[in-house]
Amino acid sequence: MIEADRLITATGQDREEQQDRAIRPLRLAEYIGQPVVREQMELFIQAARGRREALDHTLIFGPPGLGKTTLANIIAQEMGVSLKSTSGPVLERPGDLAALLTNLESGDVLFVDEIHRLSPVVEEVLYPAMEDFQLDIMIGEGPAARSIKLDLPPFTLVGATTRAGMLTNPLRDRFGIVQRLEFYSVADLTTIVGRSAAILGLPTDAEGAFEIARRARGTPRIANRLLRRVRDFAQVRGEGRITRQIADLALNLLDVDEHGLDHQDRRLLLTLIEKFDGGPVGVDSLAAAISEERHTIEDVLEPYLIQQGYMMRTPRGRVVTRHAYLHFGLNLPARMEATMADPLADAPADGE
């Protein structure tokens, strides 16, 4: 899949897990960015500790790579309890969930990543566990089947998802705390890169950290991945120190430009400009033109480009914006100049 091969994908990669664990903050005091979330969670955690109660069930949602797993770990550390981790797709049967719940100690945190992918039958078992700290278990089969209730110790369920809209209403309503993580500012990412470099023992100038941060698409996971690749460049072709010049040379070699766009992003935009006169064009035609699957365009390439204003969806299809032409140093076509006089002509919508 194209996303797994991209340096700037926000999706986690298995080989990075051990490296990320080494630089992951463990306390709210070390947590950089997300000031509103940090302040609220500090308040909720202090209140729960003061009452000697388990923290309310917490839902964390937002784009991938922004620190949902990190925040779950911090919650457990701040509460002084153990963390048990799993993910929605892993919990295939009610018994899988029951095995986890019955092994929790009082106050423990159960972290469920990709919670929107829970199966309906598992979700039904989770409702009474979250609300009443009880587990309903069916024993036997057929006419002899009977239900028994098991009491569970108070625990905190922390659910993480990139697609909060896919959660069912009954599940969403059972979370007492709901937090949305936003993309990070370049200033916060610069601080994160500097902190990670210090932990990894990498001499890094402030300008070098800034150069990495501004190409990281607002995402700490991408920033840390770029840092590791720039480290390799500095080790082989530099003197081991990450300066602005070294970071710029390394990231240009890796084909990540100053706005965080890579070859796939630029190919999509240039195809729209050169082959379809800037659009509008249907997503299937666009997919055929760049030899990619439709879902790859919709789920992998488009979101960041739309968010940054390089392209948009209209009732007639995909079109590039003035911002895309300026990014490539191209003159605006006469048609686009005329369209800009009527801003409603290409009003954003979910066109095909």
Swiss-Prot record:
Subcellular location(s) per record: Cytoplasm
Keywords of this entry: ATP-binding, Cytoplasm, DNA damage, DNA recombination, DNA repair, DNA-binding, Hydrolase, Nucleotide-binding
Top-level EC class as recorded in UniProt: hydrolase
Annotated ATP binding sites: 23-24, 65, 68-70, 131-133, 174, 184, 221
Domain of life of the native organism: Bacteria
Cross-referenced Gene3D superfamilies: 1.10.8.60, P-loop containing nucleotide triphosphate hydrolases, Winged helix-like DNA-binding domain superfamily/Winged helix DNA-binding domain
A single Gene Ontology CC term: cytoplasm
Annotated region described as Head domain (RuvB-H), given as residue ranges: 258-352
MF (Gene Ontology): ATP binding; ATP hydrolysis activity; four-way junction DNA binding; four-way junction helicase activity
Region named Small ATPAse domain (RuvB-S): 185-255
Reactions that this protein is recorded to catalyse: ATP + H2O = ADP + phosphate + H(+)
Large ATPase domain (RuvB-L) as annotated region, ranges: 4-184
Oligomer status and interactors: Homohexamer. Forms an RuvA(8)-RuvB(12)-Holliday junction (HJ) complex. HJ DNA is sandwiched between 2 RuvA tetramers; dsDNA enters through RuvA and exits via RuvB. An RuvB hexamer assembles on each DNA strand where it exits the tetramer. Each RuvB hexamer is contacted by two RuvA subunits (via domain III) on 2 adjacent RuvB subunits; this complex drives branch migration. In the full resolvosome a probable DNA-RuvA(4)-RuvB(12)-RuvC(2) complex forms which resolves the HJ.
Domain remarks: Has 3 domains, the large (RuvB-L) and small ATPase (RuvB-S) domains and the C-terminal head (RuvB-H) domain. The head domain binds DNA, while the ATPase domains jointly bind ATP, ADP or are empty depending on the state of the subunit in the translocation cycle. During a single DNA translocation step the structure of each domain remains the same, but their relative positions change.
HAMAP family in alphabetical order: DNA_HJ_migration_RuvB (MF_00016)
Family named by the database record: Belongs to the RuvB family.
Name used for this protein in its record: Holliday junction branch migration complex subunit RuvB
